[in-house]
């Protein structure tokens, strides 16, 4: 039960940070994929906003991952961040 609450909080944290950065906050989605040792948070944003979330030389994405890492230490559970983009129709784009 506590793990679910932590996971929801982490998803909300990533979503709020991303929404503050992008032009299309409605398109921001965060999906959690639980694994044995860690949880992967998949952040999906509109194609036009991917650069804003990644940032110059990946600095923004690295900063988001650093925050996740710091919170992960407190929760004793590893969270990682994957940044995905959608095409104009809202489907995952082929990378």
What do the predicted segments below correspond to?
Residues 1-50, 62-63, 67-95:
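RNA-contacting regions in translation and RNA-metabolism proteins
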Residues 54-58:
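Glycine-centered tight-turn and secondary-structure capping sites
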């Amino acid at each position: 039960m506590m793990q679910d609450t932590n996971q929801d909080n982490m998803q909300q944290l990533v979503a709020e940070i991303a929404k503050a950065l992008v032009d299309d906050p409605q398109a921001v989605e965060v999906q959690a994929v639980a694994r044995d040792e860690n949880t992967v948070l998949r952040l999906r944003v509109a194609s036009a906003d991917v650069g804003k979330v990644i940032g110059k030389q990946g600095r923004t994405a690295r900063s988001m991952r650093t925050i996740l890492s710091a919170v992960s230490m407190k929760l004793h559970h590893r969270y990682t961040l994957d940044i995905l983009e959608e095409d104009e129709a809202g489907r995952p784009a082929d990378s």
